[in-house]
Amino acid sequence: MRMQTKLIHGGISEDATTGAVSVPIYQTSTYRQDAIGRHKGYEYSRSGNPTRFALEELIADLEGGVKGFAFASGLAGIHAVFSLLQSGDHVLLGDDVYGGTFRLFNQVLVKNGLSCTIIDTSDISQIKKAIKPNTKALYLETPSNPLLKITDLAQCASVAKDHGLLTIVDNTFATPYYQNPLLLGADIVAHSGTKYLGGHSDVVAGLVTTNNEALAQEIAFFQNAIGGVLGPQDSWLLQRGIKTLGLRMEAHQKNALCVAEFLEKHPKVERVYYPGLPTHPNYELAKKQMRGFSGMLSFTLKNDSEAVAFVESLKLFILGESLGGVESLVGIPAFMTHACIPKTQREAAGIRDGLVRLSVGIEHEQDLLEDLEQAFAKIG
């Protein structure tokens, strides 16, 4: 089954009891049991809910996993995944990793005895050099947030397996429509379902899947034990969003490429970060391991001090957190999504105060270009 069709018919797409073509919202916290210890598959909605289960089956199907897991947020899912590790374990993280992931690790998980080394994961030599005897996992974002770096998933997974490491991939930017890390050797894939999968800026969710049965059992335990599960209403909204993921991603990518080409030629722009541009250093790798380039891009102005005035002059591009909705969003990572990362560390990774990140929506491309042009005109 091709991906476009799988988005609609994958997982559990219908209700077997009634024939409803949309999975019902099972808005219940508990379930009648036939006898002590005898139930019909569900006993308490933290442990399992039919609406959530349908979503979990769907993400596993889309990513090539054996089991999926739905959480109350992307970070709740990442927390559950990192719970697989033990005190004393060491993890490799990307140097421009999402600020929320950085904060979770460096302010929460360190208290549980975990440690990490920050590296440029798009450079395989840095990964090899950073591996220690107690390194247990390699955590990747590709494309990365916000510099859109591309990491060679197959190569990294091979190195990780040689050293007995788990390869964990945040696939939020690419989505299963454009990239499937499990098929390239990764062990676990995580998503912020809030973003492209939901696609309408109306749900907060996290999804995780794995192609390893033993890992699936452990993640299932932590999902239930920690309890950060996704509710049935949000599970249903996310399933509805996923049905149109293919159409939306094609539109996002078309507009993003148009915007990236416009910015690359603009005299006020210093550099554009978009893997769909031939000038991107990992363009060929992106073409090899992805089926498309998504709708995220970042750029720097020649004058960093103009960045704030520029984004505040935009009208169609909404100044706000998050990404992946049908509407275009703009932000300055240094002051927003990555503000929790120390300034010296941010700048060393290339996240300057003047770096602007765009989540390009599905509006008419000419309207987006005109909005950018009028903002440039306002800053002179």
Curated annotation (Swiss-Prot):
Transmembrane segments: none annotated. It is found in: Cytoplasm. It catalyses: O-succinyl-L-homoserine + L-cysteine = L,L-cystathionine + succinate + H(+). Its main location: cytoplasm. It comes from the Bacteria. Homotetramer. This is Cystathionine gamma-synthase. It comes from Helicobacter pylori (strain ATCC 700392 / 26695) (Campylobacter pylori).
